């Protein structure tokens, strides 16, 4: 036999045989070959190696230490002490309400707090102010004043501070006509804070930070009067404050504080009533600091850390007050105020004063 390939329309390949006599060929049907049964090999699962267990994992703490937060509280405390002392333009306000010109004094006290960026402070303070004012021929009422504030601070981990702030200033009140007015005031002074910062285990660092401060502000208002003595008075205020920088030591740590400038604005609404020789009023205000960042560097040995304290924010307040004139030359005034919201929040503050005209 022999092997041949036959190709036709349907192709088939295999063996053929033929006969020698007549040359006839026959196709030899191949024997079927069985298909082997698949025998897959089982897959052995791979067990991942266990991760090693760290019996003492490292837990990262805050970037700034409790000592740094205590020092930062003292620095911000100075700024808020100046804000409490110099930013209310109080004397121009009572002159606008009808207080006579002359020699005057005001004493009061209260609380305020500040929380933000890891610090939490509470301050009790006493404030004394006094001055003299008079009317001019140009339609302005002008005066000068001195102010003093003393406060006790509480910081995190029983840290503490003793604040002192002193300022001298000038102010003016101008009637613009049509029941409109403008108040101007400028103050310059110095603030200091003798502080002790503590950590979780009571270790303390003590020091004193001081800075010169400057403020100038303006207020515009319009009085809408009614026949029964009631009035409504919308107000708008804008002020600019600058603090000089300071460099001081707190124990083994050296601190370098940059100067800071801040611009703040406020809107208020006063509702009151005049009667005979006096008046009473209620006032609500919303204030916003548009700028201000305190940059501080803390150096211990060869290590220096830096913090930024943002002073921008909004706070609201509420006040009640009044005045009464005994005669043309002697008058008393008082007010009660509190903060409603904000990082800087005043607690209840009580103030009283008198004016004597020569």
Set out the residue ranges of the language-model regions.
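Predominantly extracellular/luminal carbohydrate-interaction, adhesion, and secreted-enzyme modules
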Residues: 1, 238-240, 267-268, 321
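Long, low-complexity, Gly/Thr
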Residues: 5-11, 16-17, 137, 327-330, ...
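Outer-membrane beta-barrel strand-turn architecture
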Residues: 96-97, 134-138, 174-178, 224-228, ...
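Solvent-exposed flexible segments
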Residues: 232, 237-243
